[in-house]
Swiss-Prot record:
Keywords attached to this entry: Cell cycle, Cell division, Cytoplasm, Septation
Record's subcellular location: Cytoplasm
Assembly information from the UniProt record: Homodimer. Interacts with FtsZ.
Cytoplasm among keywords: yes
UniProt entry tagged with the keyword NAD: no
GN (gene name): sepF
Entries under HAMAP family matching the protein: SepF
Record-level GO cellular component terms: cytoplasm
Name of the protein: Cell division protein SepF
PANTHER family listed in its UniProt record: CELL DIVISION PROTEIN SEPF
Bias (Basic and acidic residues) ranges: 23-36
InterPro entries named among the record's database cross-references: Cell_div_SepF, Cell_div_SepF/SepF-rel, SepF-like_sf
Gene source species: Bacillus mycoides (strain KBAB4)
Amino acid sequence: MSWSKVKYFFFDTPEEKEAAQYSYEKEQTDMKKQQDPPEQQDVPFAKVQPKQNVVSIETAKQSSKVVLLEPRTYSEAQGISDHLKGRRAVVINLQRMSTDQAVRIVDFLSGTVYAIGGDIQKIGPKTFMCTPENVDIVGAISELFGEEEETNIKRW
């Protein structure tokens, strides 16, 4: 390998010599010809309204209902749950049922109330109030139901 090849390898190559022979015209760019950035335009937008905690009295009056029920069989539990899903409070009197079926209904309704985020409270002997999440229960009824409740202590 000759010294000239090494020289071309590191320093000057024949292609560079050819490129140096050509003359390039320098392009001048006109700064005025370049596009200016577009002007900012006002774009209308919808104003986001914060969620209001105020409900009109007429709306609350129409949607608030309490359903009084006295089921006689366990098969009526699904109908009671449908009232709860419809956001209506339900008062259930279970005195005309056998204790076993009453316990099953209370278990079923407890699951329903839990699923919808509501509440269930005992308001008397074999009488319960189930409420959906849109109804608040305030206060408590004392347990002065008499001796009947004390003798029948099985589950509730």
